[in-house]
Amino acid sequence: MLSKKFGLSMIVLGIMSSSAFADSIVEGRTLNVAVSPASPPMLFKSADGKLQGIDLELFSSYCQSRHCKLNITEYAWDGMLGAVASGQADVAFSGISITDKRKKVIDFSEPYYINSFYLVSMANHKITLNNLNELNKYSIGYPRGMAYSDLIKNDLEPKGYYSLSKVKLYPTYNETMADLKNGNLDLAFIEEPVYFTFKNKKKMPIESRYVFKNVDQLGIAFKKGSPVRDDFNLWLKEQGPQKISGIVDSWMK
């Protein structure tokens, strides 16, 4: 059985050798990549300013196997998505959620991670959510452009649990978590990998108050109609669930 972190059960690919794809699709090419490195451990910067993370390791490994190069450009989150949607970039990755809205302008790889959304507070801010009706008592924030807005708009708002107009939006998770720490925000929406990074690696005293389990999938984004997407899916299949999960798990520790 595939682990929840490797959602490749629905891959359906035509029979085509990896060498045929490599020779005709990406071998010798330089792929333009758009990133927004503010979603650890999917993509972020080390203390010395170097890009690192799950997404970079995955796509660099793919490119190494296919003998291509990466030309990486940093953007704000919306700019990153706009770059790949417009064709300015061939690829985008930074822990990008696969959504129906985005699929209208972007092609996605098969998901490599089945994601959960956490509502977190500072540990000393004793918030108990017995049910979602209590959400309206609290301020909620998260980085702009994230898939949490879809969850609120399509699920929480119609049920009267929370209004999208009440959400506080921030440039990145860093600003979101800073406001949470400073007491200017009650709850932050934060995805599972980022939650464990802040809690376990950055030692931020936060606690989960509610979990929306397995509501999200992360994938690599490609410009519409790109054959590179199909080759990347083939590469994922070649690696197998165990190897991909091993890469993901190594960044979660």
Curated annotation (Swiss-Prot):
Annotated D-alanine binding sites: G95, S97, R102, A147, E191
Protein name: ABC transporter D-alanine-binding periplasmic protein
Gene3D superfamilies associated with the record: Periplasmic binding protein-like II
Keyword ATP-binding: no
Family designation: Belongs to the bacterial solute-binding protein 3 family.
Gene Ontology biological process terms, A to Z: D-alanine transmembrane transport; symbiont-mediated suppression of host innate immune response
Organism ancestry: Bacteria, Pseudomonadati, Pseudomonadota, Gammaproteobacteria, Enterobacterales
Main location: periplasm
Secretion signal span: 1-22
Induction note: Expression is increased when grown in low magnesium minimal medium with an acidic pH, in a manner dependent on response regulator SsrB.
UniProt superkingdom: Bacteria
Cellular localisation: Periplasm
Keywords in alphabetical order: Amino-acid transport, Periplasm, Signal, Transport, Virulence
Gene coding for it: dalS
Source species: Salmonella typhimurium (strain LT2 / SGSC1412 / ATCC 700720)
